[in-house]
Amino acid sequence: MKINVNNLTYKTLSEGSIPALLELQEDAFAHAGDSTDFLRRNTPETLLPCFGGDSLVLGVYDGELLVAFGILYCAGDTKENLAHDLDEVSDVTENANVKLVIVRYEYRGNGLQKELIARLCAHAEQRGYKWLSSTVSPENPWSMNNLIANGFTEAKVLVKYGGLKRILYAKKIN
């Protein structure tokens, strides 16, 4: 559905939005057909650390309806930090993950994922991060194209998240 993106609002979200994020994630799975490996199924426990510190959870609203969200996760030295898999990064704490971007099915095709990634990148750059990274399923060309459009390049192919094949993308920003 084509929409007037100028009527949408972007809001920083808090932990209280986790149920809405999970509902939107389930919407993505419901429209995935047989391809359920394209997205990692997050839980409240995997989302909770994404709030606070330098991390950012950014929602896009059409009125009161959450139509998209993006998560920049500054994971520090935890195992969730994708920089552990990047040979070029010597200090993993200088990396932030573009962890998750989901757009409600009816709102796809309006550039929302690309815009969310751009805003997450700008947030990381403003906070002095030197690297950004993200993983994408090889079955998800839309996300790959939106990362590439935001200056990311393919770093390597990995098996992550309990056996899912992922392409690791990275971007040097500072």
Question: What spans do the regions from the language model cover?
Answer:
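Conserved acetyl-CoA-binding loop-helix of GNAT-fold acetyltransferases
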Residues: 100-103, 109-122, 145, 149
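Conserved active-site alpha-helix within GNAT-family acetyltransferase domains
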Residues: 114, 126, 138-157
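Conserved beta-strand-loop-alpha-helix junction that forms the acyl-donor binding cleft
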Residues: 108, 134-144, 162
